[in-house]
Amino acid sequence: MSSSGTPDLPVLLTDLKFQYTKIFINNEWHDSVSGKKFPVFNPATEEKLCEVEEGDKEDVNKAVAAARQAFQIGSPWRTMDASERGRLLYKLADLVERDRLILATMESMNGGKLFSNAYLMDLGGCLKTLRYCAGWADKIQGRTIPSDGNFFTYTRHEPVGVCGQILPWNFPLLMFLWKIAPALSCGNTVVVKPAEQTPLSALHVATLIKEAGFPPGVVNIVPGYGPTAGAAISSHMDIDKVAFTGSTEVGKLIKEAAGKSNLKRVTLELGGKSPFIVFADADLETALEVTHQALFYHQGQCCVAASRLFVEESIYDEFVRRSVERAKKYVLGNPLTPGVSQGPQIDKEQYDKILDLIESGKKEGAKLECGGGPWGNKGYFIQPTVFSNVSDEMRIAKEEIFGPVQQIMKFKSLDDVIKRANNTTYGLFAGSFTKDLDKAITVSAALQAGTVWVNCYGVVSAQCPFGGFKMSGNGREMGEYGFHEYTEVKTVTVKISQKNS
């Protein structure tokens, strides 16, 4: 343990074996009904790591049936004390902590994450998420209501039922636990589809779920592709709720499928094009580093990425110059290699999309300050890229890039920058840097975003609700608000002979 309280990095695993590659239903491993498998790759080397069973509609049907059986009235899960649900989540956290090195190595090999970030940040967040949600299990309470007349009225917060959960590839394990932990804390059962690019860590945790003692059918995991397994979850008539993290385009399809099937409840955490405003009175040194990390963390593959950086005119030129200097310090390479500070993009599709957007920035007149192309001869690496003189109409200023591409735009006045910051279909996150408290509060109230950070960015914790405005999604995850998404409120009124105050 370091003096700061963070764990020291362990010796890397050199012989990691991927043991768990099947479909997990009823606490057992299954082959896919179709017999199909799909390959899983290391994006840093383009080498195949293993093959995973490819679930589709028939496998989803089996998983939903298991989840429904586990949710029946009188089942071990439904009759379990809420405090016992919490104990199981605490136990799962302990097991994840035991296997922290294995899981962090998987996230790095399969997801292209820097090992240090996977071990310290992602796995650290996983443990905090599980323990936070475990503590809530016996604190999800209803109320008594003083209704008129001789009646006794109270509310119950009941679990929604069978929840379908569709995961992204950028934070595979953290998003898996963000989804299942609040759902299980509230007493739901789940059917989870990991992203096809990054299914391995969720499948490993499936074994820990069984080891922790969760009853069969409570957690089911069906790896597969979005148009097959994901679509089957979204349209399934016996799934009561679906939660999805991913692109806005897919989020629309999921909401449409939910509406056309059984009007299942939907929680969506979608894309963003988040503005970050740096005023001339900001602490420049800190603002430079924070705005840099706000974009380049995990190769820019974060929904929170501050991908529209607005800098006040009087400090613009210096800010651009120093931002370029910072971007040029990166060391690209295999994310398991000590000293490497930038890994690969997740796959060829994302790699090509990012390079296309970089080319559009060049063609539309933005000034390329550094980077602007691929790196190396294998793996999906892209040079850290900075554009200046970016106008609001350019594609790189409007579209979510999801890559290591920073756009720095100039502004003159407070009213102007607020209007420009809000001129987007997205509304996920926003930030500002200023020493002026009045300005900070004014901007925070005016920005149309689910989270606004002041003099910091990307500060995410289990205690805080997370979600977006506009086309960045519906509902909230984590914090007390996140549990509301996994309960139904029932009003119970009982006739009594006499009511007394």
From Swiss-Prot:
Gene Ontology annotations of biological process type: cellular detoxification of aldehyde; fructosamine catabolic process; gamma-aminobutyric acid biosynthetic process; maintenance of lens transparency; retinoid metabolic process; retinol metabolic process
GO molecular function: 3-deoxyglucosone dehydrogenase activity; acetaldehyde dehydrogenase (NAD+) activity; aldehyde dehydrogenase (NAD+) activity; aminobutyraldehyde dehydrogenase (NAD+) activity; benzaldehyde dehydrogenase (NAD+) activity; NAD binding; retinal dehydrogenase activity
Residues bearing the modification Phosphothreonine: 337
Keyword check for rRNA processing: no
N6-acetyllysine PTM sites in chain numbering: 91, 128, 252, 353, 367, 410, 419, 435, 495
Positions contributing to NAD(+) binding: 167-170, 193-196, 226-227, 246-247, 269-271, 349-353, 400-402
Database matches in InterPro entries: Ald_DH/histidinol_DH (IPR016161), Ald_DH_C (IPR016163), Ald_DH_CS_CYS (IPR016160), Ald_DH_CS_GLU (IPR029510), Ald_DH_N (IPR016162), Aldehyde_DH_dom (IPR015590)
Chief place where the protein resides: cytoplasm
GO cellular component, one term: axon
Locations listed in the record: Cytoplasm, Cytosol; Cell projection, Axon
Modified residues (N-acetylserine): 2
Cysteines paired by S-S bonds: none
Modified residues (Phosphoserine): 413
Keyword terms: Acetylation, Cell projection, Cytoplasm, Lipid metabolism, NAD, Oxidoreductase, Phosphoprotein
Record field: catalytic activity: an aldehyde + NAD(+) + H2O = a carboxylate + NADH + 2 H(+); all-trans-retinal + NAD(+) + H2O = all-trans-retinoate + NADH + 2 H(+); 9-cis-retinal + NAD(+) + H2O = 9-cis-retinoate + NADH + 2 H(+); 11-cis-retinal + NAD(+) + H2O = 11-cis-retinoate + NADH + 2 H(+)
Active-site residue numbers: 269 (proton acceptor), 303 (nucleophile)
Subunit and interaction comment: Homotetramer. Interacts with PRMT3; the interaction is direct, inhibits ALDH1A1 aldehyde dehydrogenase activity and is independent of the methyltransferase activity of PRMT3.
Role noted for this protein: Cytosolic dehydrogenase that catalyzes the irreversible oxidation of a wide range of aldehydes to their corresponding carboxylic acid. Functions downstream of retinol dehydrogenases and catalyzes the oxidation of retinaldehyde into retinoic acid, the second step in the oxidation of retinol/vitamin A into retinoic acid. This pathway is crucial to control the levels of retinol and retinoic acid, two important molecules which excess can be teratogenic and cytotoxic.
Protein name from the UniProt record: Aldehyde dehydrogenase 1A1
Biological source species: Equus caballus (Horse)
